[in-house]
């Protein structure tokens, strides 16, 4: 039996994983549950982990997996339910002798180069190579992939060297992680917020300042839907 706060937090994490492919930060959890400190979130996370509803992944920034869901949130995840984060093994890593082959419908996406998760870099529009992603990750619409350069989104679980999967769109809701084109020349991966006639591009790393620009200087090029990480 979960308390109301535990259930509310689990639902919030689940919805963010479904929407963004990455879990919310502790600050976002604190605001969503109207708590005064992060210590309350730590206690709730620990309780959910002890009860087997979530799993924290070691040595990764803000990495949480949902293991199961209570009936009030739709029951346990169906077969194949996974956060939309792919941890890829190195190609030279030996396969266990008892490993069974698994067939997954894959889609080839163009990797359009590197995107800055830091100071914006020049916009890239040339395909460097292709990457295979599960078909369930992309859904409808046009998609492409970008390799992340920088550490400004580490608290969103996005690290330097990760490959992000982007759905093409020219619109975004507040809080979406987007590919933003600044002045038609610089591309950056940031969280999007509309502030009146301006656009705020917010990093997920306190070392980076939020950039607030007139809306006519920013064009949304796509929204984050998944992430691929190789060790």
UniProtKB/Swiss-Prot annotation:
Pfam family, one: LexA_DNA_bind
UniProt source species: Ruegeria pomeroyi (strain ATCC 700808 / DSM 15171 / DSS-3)
Biased composition (Basic and acidic residues): 86-95
EC number(s) on file: 3.4.21.88
Molecular functions (GO terms): DNA binding; serine-type endopeptidase activity
Entry function: Represses a number of genes involved in the response to DNA damage (SOS response), including recA and lexA. In the presence of single-stranded DNA, RecA interacts with LexA causing an autocatalytic cleavage which disrupts the DNA-binding part of LexA, leading to derepression of the SOS regulon and eventually DNA repair.
Catalytic activity line of the entry: Hydrolysis of Ala-|-Gly bond in repressor LexA
Protein name, entry field: LexA repressor
Signal peptide extent: none
HAMAP family linked to this entry: LexA (MF_00015)
Active site feature: 152 (for autocatalytic cleavage activity), 190 (for autocatalytic cleavage activity)
Sequence segments annotated as region (Disordered): 79-98
Recorded name of the encoding gene: lexA
